Amino acid sequence: MIKVSVIGATGYAGAELIRLLLSHSKVELKNLSSKSFVGKNINEIYPNLNKNLDKLLLDENEIFEDTDVVFASLPAGLSDDIANKCFEKNILFIDLGADFRLDNEEDYKNWYGNEYKYKNLHKEAIYSIPEIIKYDNVYNKKELKNAKIIGNPGCYPTSIGLALAPALVNKFIIKDDIIIDSKSGATGAGRELKLNTHYTECNEAFAPYKIAEHRHTPEIEQTLSNIYGEDIKVTFVPHLLPLNRGIVSTIYAKLENKNIKLKDIHNTYKNFYKDSAFVRVLNIGEIANLKYVKYSNYCDISLHMDDRTNKLIIVSTIDNMVKGAAGQAIQNMNIALGLKEDEGLNFIPPAF
């Protein structure tokens, strides 16, 4: 059995990791840590774990003993020391935070206000959206199966990268005219108390936030640029949905070829993802719906064309806690350790 530990176990992504790992046939959940709840039982914090898990929450420094894999789900700037300890102990480290997502340290400084503490570790790290890493002109040179540090992608970049990768690889769209309108459930903001996620603030409300300044912007642009092979800038506007979980991204891009048919683009997308366990390209005429990916590691993509404006419109839906966080982290672990990619993740989402 693979011995797995989780740092930041009481945040939303950490709790989702625990839920999914408990169903993984190759994993033994070893140690859990939480800065806020050291000494408490995890099932005191999350009663859904009663009769499924009985573990005390440890100090972070106690996590590394008798462990093969460490997941960390922490705010930006807190993962470098953990990664260094894991690297020294030959433990696979998977970071669900932002510290190992950006290639360029200047971007990390500008958007997160931090510097790389161990620059050599950032050269070792692999950023992986598994379905499209082979098209990434930076990270496809590294072997995920031999990774020691994995930067798990953010939720918005995952939904957007999967939606746009086939169009960019096949040069269907003009790279300088991409508009992205994304909506996320409240769990995307984390468990920490914030005014805009109070029930009375977000219930029966719907509004954009962090317009033109969301921290996922450089990660989105990096992912798209690495795939296309040239620098890409996008217009990205996120919105807060009055839901617990899920992301819907609606993407608008001008077509390079006015004569291309939607069926040809659709066939290319179907072929692009034909071997993917988790990306579902819907039939022409169907529209991706958040309802059918919740609690799953699936990404649903629907394709549409506006002939009047020569625009390709792509709708992408994921569960931000699963494919956008914990599920994708487990998917990356599976690949890195030579397991079946869908191990512990191959379940059908509820219909309602």
Swiss-Prot record:
InterPro entries: AGPR_AS, AGPR_type-1, NAD(P)-bd_dom_sf, NAGSA_dehydrogenase, Semialdehyde_DH_NAD-bd. The keyword NADP applies. Keywords: Amino-acid biosynthesis, Arginine biosynthesis, Cytoplasm, NADP, Oxidoreductase. The active site is at C155. It is an enzyme of class 1 (oxidoreductase). GO terms for cellular component: cytoplasm. Pfam families: Semialdhyde_dh (PF01118), Semialdhyde_dhC_1 (PF22698). It is found in: Cytoplasm. GO terms for molecular function: N-acetyl-gamma-glutamyl-phosphate reductase activity; NAD binding; NADP+ binding. Pathway: Amino-acid biosynthesis; L-arginine biosynthesis; N(2)-acetyl-L-ornithine from L-glutamate: step 3/4. CDD domains: AGPR_1_C, AGPR_1_N. It catalyses: N-acetyl-L-glutamate 5-semialdehyde + phosphate + NADP(+) = N-acetyl-L-glutamyl 5-phosphate + NADPH + H(+). One of its GO terms (biological process) is L-arginine biosynthetic process. Its EC number is 1.2.1.38. Catalyzes the NADPH-dependent reduction of N-acetyl-5-glutamyl phosphate to yield N-acetyl-L-glutamate 5-semialdehyde. Belongs to the NAGSA dehydrogenase family. Type 1 subfamily. This is N-acetyl-gamma-glutamyl-phosphate reductase. It comes from Brachyspira hyodysenteriae (strain ATCC 49526 / WA1). The lineage of its organism: Bacteria, Pseudomonadati, Spirochaetota, Spirochaetia, Brachyspirales. The gene is argC.
